[in-house]
């Protein structure tokens, strides 16, 4: 009995540390509320259905000879009203809830705060994350830091296939697309270390494509970390260096870059833009044409 009790306790408490259900940011808390409300509303359908399934199975079983047999019964307005009205009300409520929360939690929507936001550019590589702090001219791989209660504005792109950026404890997932910029606004309300992941399959190293998001209490602690990164001997000031760190690699360790090439994020993004391909194609045509004329 004691063993069974321990197993049940372990089973029911197993989800308590799930980041989705253990929110530490305003956006994540709102999303948790949406999940909880939707779950409770679904129970208004699921519980009666399970109850009626068991009840009708017992009441109208073949061995129960005490029930009245009605072979010509085919209609009940009471049942029709119940089975249509209740689902319509619940679905309508959930539709309104989803619509309102979709606008309320729009990833591009700025978070209102008295504190100035921190800007972080995130680039999905194979299979690691590059983070650029444009206001501090530094970059990191697989680690970010920010003070609590200070909005974070992410610009996200990919230098490889489509990916997805997600810090479950803080809020929304957003896709990372090559040649595109997606935006995400988050904020941390508690001090802690949170796991960030890639939530979209991007190759055999995808499962190890994780990073650490650290929220600190004081802005001075964050600035000390910035100075630590600035003291690094490694610089990310050429595209050649970027090409080296872009080489596919699993289990890539945390790395700091004391300076970053100007406008690097846009240069990465524009590698995959239509305009870039058109310019490359036109340039190739000009080179071919020039070589052809020289041969003539």
Curated annotation (Swiss-Prot):
Residues 16-33, 100-296 are extracellular. One of its GO terms (molecular function) is cytochrome bo3 ubiquinol oxidase activity. Residues 55-78 are cytoplasmic. It is found in: Cell membrane. Residues 1-15 form the signal peptide. SUPFAM superfamilies: Cupredoxins, Cytochrome c oxidase subunit II-like, transmembrane region. The keyword Ligase does not apply. Gene3D superfamilies: 1.10.287.90, Cupredoxins - blue copper proteins (2.60.40.420). InterPro entries: CcO_II, CcO_II-like_C, COX_ARM, Cupredoxin, CuRO_UO_II, Cyt_c_oxidase_su2_TM_dom, Cyt_c_oxidase_su2_TM_sf, Cyt_o_ubiquinol_oxidase_su2. The keyword Metal-binding does not apply. GO terms for cellular component: plasma membrane. A lipid is attached at residue 16 (S-diacylglycerol cysteine). It holds the Pfam family COX_ARM. A lipid is attached at residue 16 (N-palmitoyl cysteine). The chain crosses the membrane at residues 34-54, 79-99. Belongs to the cytochrome c oxidase subunit 2 family. This is Cytochrome bo(3) ubiquinol oxidase subunit 2. It comes from Buchnera aphidicola subsp. Acyrthosiphon pisum (strain APS).
